[in-house]
Amino acid sequence: MSSAQNIKKSIMAPVLDNNPIALQVLGVCSALAVTTKLETAFVMTLAVTFVTALSNFSVSLIRNHIPNSVRIIVQMAIIASLVIVVDQVLKAYLYDISKQLSVFVGLIITNCIVMGRAEAFAMKSAPVPSLIDGIGNGLGYGFVLITVGFFRELFGSGKLFGMEVLPLVSNGGWYQPNGLMLLAPSAFFLIGFLIWVIRILKPEQVEAKE
């Protein structure tokens, strides 16, 4: 397999074939909380992708010099440093979105996807493949966030990225926003529906009956 094909596989596989949320069931809490708007879902996707990619790269660079007994602490320190950078950048340039994301930016530190890729992949792989793996898993996480955020904002408020898409009754249109879509349970059901769709498309992901 060529280098280009390997890169494509590393980036695309976590989207449908091995999605961190849909198949591995990781990072679900933040997916429920930050998807009321497409804007916050998109920014969270960028933040997690940035942290996962650079933490993978950094851990891989020094993996042969990390004592096994403190490897988790070292990984956490690297991830926490990157999250602090992301948090400060958001507060400086996207303050309103930073307020909407609230504590969930800081909680990237404990996101199982970020920690999982650092431990399972970066500790055993070269820096560049680790970087690509981080990007792929960040995009896989973002695929679910953006899909859920799209439907929640569209049907919950009739808007996308804050701009009116469906003519609202309050403005003389025909669409009455469904407030239920803006509540956390709706995200839970949408994620479940998305998992169902993915497993129809990818039947090999269905667990075997015991």
Curated annotation (Swiss-Prot):
Residue spans crossing the bilayer: 42-62, 72-92, 103-123, 131-151, 178-198
A GO cellular component annotation in the UniProt record: plasma membrane
Source superkingdom: Bacteria
UniProt keyword annotation of Membrane present: yes
Family matches, as InterPro entries: NqrD, NqrDE/RnfAE
Protein topology in the membrane: Multi-pass membrane protein
Primary site of residence: membrane
UniProt entry keywords in alphabetical sequence: Cell inner membrane, Cell membrane, Ion transport, Membrane, NAD, Sodium, Sodium transport, Translocase, Transmembrane, Transmembrane helix, Transport, Ubiquinone
Catalytic activity: a ubiquinone + n Na(+)(in) + NADH + H(+) = a ubiquinol + n Na(+)(out) + NAD(+)
Assembly and interaction partners: Composed of six subunits; NqrA, NqrB, NqrC, NqrD, NqrE and NqrF.
Family indicated by similarity: Belongs to the NqrDE/RnfAE family.
The protein's role, per its UniProt record: NQR complex catalyzes the reduction of ubiquinone-1 to ubiquinol by two successive reactions, coupled with the transport of Na(+) ions from the cytoplasm to the periplasm. NqrA to NqrE are probably involved in the second step, the conversion of ubisemiquinone to ubiquinol.
Protein name in the entry: Na(+)-translocating NADH-quinone reductase subunit D
